[in-house]
Amino acid sequence: MEQKQNESTELRPEGARVMDAPLVTMNVNDFIRQIKDESAWEKNDRNAMAIYKTEGMRIVLIALHEDAIMEKHTANGIISLQVLEGEINFNSADQSVSVKKGEMIALHKGLPHSVAAVKESVFLLTIADFRD
């Protein structure tokens, strides 16, 4: 398997990090500090960073300021969402749940949902699309 990494950008000059390899280690606390130190965090109600990407799966670290809303949308795979800091409200067509630090949820592919930050929050979003 070929190792893949992202390229550095103007917004993330130190960005060259491994995105896919037989084994990828990630320091999530360092990534949290990084996205909260970026100008995008200061200018917007959120910031995010893909920390792993391979065929069939992606992991994204997302930080939301208090009261930030991710409007209703769908995902092209099964998702899991694990709150690392703060608290969010996760709303699907069938129910609305509060998800706090240390808790997680899972949702099937293609179901409409939205996310609202009750307070400043950080979570890991995993999107998996497996074809058996």
Regions found by a protein language model. Name each.
Residues M1-G56:
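A short, N-terminal "cap"/entry segment at the start of jelly-roll beta-barrel domains
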Residues W41-D45, E55-T74:
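Conserved short histidine dyad/triad with adjacent acidic residue
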Residues E55, L84-E85, K100-K101, K119:
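A cytosolic small-molecule/anion-sensing beta-strand core signal
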Residues R58, E87-N89, S96, P112, ...:
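Structural motif
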Residues N76-N89, A93:
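Glycine- and acidic-residue-biased ligand/ion/polar-headgroup-sensing regions
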Residues D94-K109:
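Short acidic-glycine-tyrosine-enriched beta hairpin
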Residues K109-D132:
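Ligand-binding loop in jelly-roll beta-barrel domains
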